[in-house]
């Protein structure tokens, strides 16, 4: 089973459900106070997709957006935010460095932050964003009818997507939730390390992954509270094989039609294939020929140039 988010609102990823919704909520509150939303500036840090959602939401709400990106965000993802009217600021360093710069600038200029990660004292907006993400779970439950997945593989950066999916599924299925499996990059496995240590554990990212949306070294506080008791297993994967899986999706090898699967979308199938070829992991995950595995296709070709390079066309 594959939940395809490649066409969501024309923005190419699930992020369209969260950031834009949070911006709309902020703008509405601003207007209730008798203020002109044209004078509102929202700020965020991003690897690309979340910033695009915030930029789009700001454009729709008639406000401004200030987007902080790190050194390894592609030029194409930067351009996608700029054409929506965002003022994009590139910071040296990784995602955590861009988030620190965003926090500093927001405090100095009194800008509300629209972040999909949470920290001490900052929870309301990330909860709104996760509420937006929960639409995916409602759609999954509705489309599956009486059937339910035995395993769900969740790509994880800071954990907002995974938490937004798991919470409604837990409400619906409770004890029949099935196995919830996180997949991260080897370079930024903050959830795997945090679960292993029993507490949130920061990863100092030394090398960037091809799966840009997974390049986050610190778990979201709210996501941690939801995922710590609900994740059954954590996996981390290398970049090798991601391009090949994207090619297979594009060629229609996993169904009747071609699927536009971005780098992060390939991570779930990569994890499943690793398990399939490793009897020990297969047994640990309690997989068998009757398993019904749900993969989350988080994005399409959000960087069209890179996508074409990776699929070879």
Regions found by a protein language model. Name each.
Residues 1-313:
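PLP-dependent amino-acid enzyme catalytic core
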């Amino acid at each position: 089973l594959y939940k395809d988010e490649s066409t969501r609102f024309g923005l190419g990823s699930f992020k369209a459900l969260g950031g834009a919704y949070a911006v709309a909520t902020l703008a509405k509150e601003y207007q209730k106070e008798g203020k002109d939303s044209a004078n509102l500036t929202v700020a965020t840090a991003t690897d690309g997709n979340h910033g695009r959602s915030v930029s789009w939401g700001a454009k729709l709400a008639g406000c401004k957006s200030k987007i902080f990106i790190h050194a390894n965000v592609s030029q194409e993802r930067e351009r996608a935010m700029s054409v929506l009217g965002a003022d994009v600021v590139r910071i040296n360093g990784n995602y955590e460095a861009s988030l620190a710069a965003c926090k500093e600038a927001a405090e100095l200029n009194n800008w509300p932050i629209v972040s999909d990660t949470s920290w001490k004292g900052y929870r309301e907006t990330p909860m709104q964003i996760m509420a937006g993400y929960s639409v995916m779970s409602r759609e999954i439950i509705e489309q599956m009818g009486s059937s339910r997945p035995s395993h769900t593989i969740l790509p994880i950066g800071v954990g907002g997507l995974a938490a937004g999916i798991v919470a409604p599924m837990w409400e619906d299925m409770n004890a029949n939730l099935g196995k919830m499996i996180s997949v991260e990059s080897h370079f930024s496995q903050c959830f795997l390390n945090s679960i292993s240590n029993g507490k949130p554990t920061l990863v100092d990212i030394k090398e960037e992954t091809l799966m840009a949306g997974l390049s986050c070294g610190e778990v979201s506080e709210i996501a941690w509270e939801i995922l710590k008791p609900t994740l059954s297993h954590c996996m981390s994967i290398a970049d090798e094989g991601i391009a090949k899986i994207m090619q297979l999706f594009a060629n229609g090898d996993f169904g009747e039609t071609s699927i536009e699967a971005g780098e992060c979308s390939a991570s779930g199938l990569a994890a499943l294939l690793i398990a399939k070829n490793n009897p020990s992991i297969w047994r640990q995950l309690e997989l068998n020929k009757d398993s019904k595995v749900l993969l989350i296709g988080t994005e399409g070709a959000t960087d069209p140039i890179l996508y074409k390079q990776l699929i070879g066309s």
